[in-house]
Amino acid sequence: MASAEPLTALSRWYLYAIHGYFCEVMFTAAWEFVVNLNWKFPGVTSVWALFIYGTSILIVERMYLRLRGRCPLLLRCLIYTLWTYLWEFTTGFILRQFNACPWDYSQFDFDFMGLITLEYAVPWFCGALIMEQFIIRNTLRLRFDKDAEPGEPSGALALANGHVKTD
């Protein structure tokens, strides 16, 4: 049987970066529709989002692996949300020094320096829940088989409902 290895940290970072980038575009499109009823759904983000999300989710993955047996899900999501605020503030502050910060929350009632806003606490918390339960857990299950041939699976390794057949 082929030896399947877990994805490398760089491979997982890449998946997390692309996922975060996509979610950012979808969120801004939905926000534009809700606030302005814009049926064009123009979703936008910055290339910086790739680094920001990829790195942040990889760090949350490490938190998940350390906390999963030690504290309940809702507490973990609260910790991830606090991390998200710290990371968003830090990366925004650094990018602002180069006039490169792509977001500005100054128009929100509960913003801090225009870099973070409490109005996003519930979306960040829900995002943390989805991130742990679906994105991180499933990404950690992915395997890379360096000996696999390109093409459709066949024989003993044929897939059935997303699971490798072993019989």
Swiss-Prot record:
Mind telling me which InterPro entries this protein's record contains?
Answer: CmpB_TMEM229
Residues forming coiled coils: none
User: Membrane-crossing residues?
Assistant: 15-35, 41-61, 74-94, 110-130
What ranges are annotated Extracellular (topological domains)? Answer: 36-40, 95-109
Keyword Transmembrane part of the UniProt annotation? yes
Bilayer topology: Multi-pass membrane protein
Swiss-Prot/TrEMBL keywords: Membrane, Transmembrane, Transmembrane helix
One Pfam entry name: ABC_trans_CmpB
* UniProt-annotated location(s): Membrane
Q: Which GO cellular component terms are attached?
A: membrane
Keyword Transmembrane among record annotations: yes
What family does this belong to? Belongs to the TMEM229 family.
What PANTHER family does the entry give?
Answer: TRANSMEMBRANE PROTEIN 229 FAMILY MEMBER (PTHR31746), TRANSMEMBRANE PROTEIN 229B (PTHR31746:SF3)
Query: What name does this protein carry?
Result: Transmembrane protein 229B
Biological source species: Homo sapiens
Gene coding for it: TMEM229B
